[in-house]
Amino acid sequence: MRVYVLNGPNLGRLGTRQPEVYGTTTYADLVELCQRTGRELGLEVVVRQTDAEHELLGWLHEAADLGAAVVLNPAAWSHYSVAVRDACALLRAPLVEVHISNIHAREPFRHQSVVSAVATGVICGLGVDGYRLALYHLAARHR
């Protein structure tokens, strides 16, 4: 099973951006975690990150066309991007929304995600381990 692990704006800065919120794991470490977990579970994992919304939309369309499952950290786009939400709604396979921090324990403008309503499930506040848990969930659903 193919799984796209898609990451939105500023996640390429993991390890240096607000380590008190996002931890010290780098983006390269996150990619390795996802790929290693995917290998252990027999998943074909494709990990991508972008700061350009149109690029994320293209990847979501690609996943929809291929019937691939998605682990998505939409980052700031989760709070306001109807375009990202609508692209997620096109997916035919499961979508797990992941946030490294607990968005409900942060500033009020971060409490709502427009993506959550079209996601199969949401994991937040568990650090980068949320990605691993999302991949385990998708593998279990596939069996």
Swiss-Prot record:
UniProt keyword Cell division, yes or no: no
Catalytic activity: 3-dehydroquinate = 3-dehydroshikimate + H2O
Residues reported to bind substrate: 73, 79, 86, 100-101, 110
Domain of life of the source: Bacteria
Family per record: Belongs to the type-II 3-dehydroquinase family.
Quaternary structure, from the entry: Homododecamer.
Protein name as it appears in the record: 3-dehydroquinate dehydratase
Organism of origin: Salinispora arenicola (strain CNS-205)
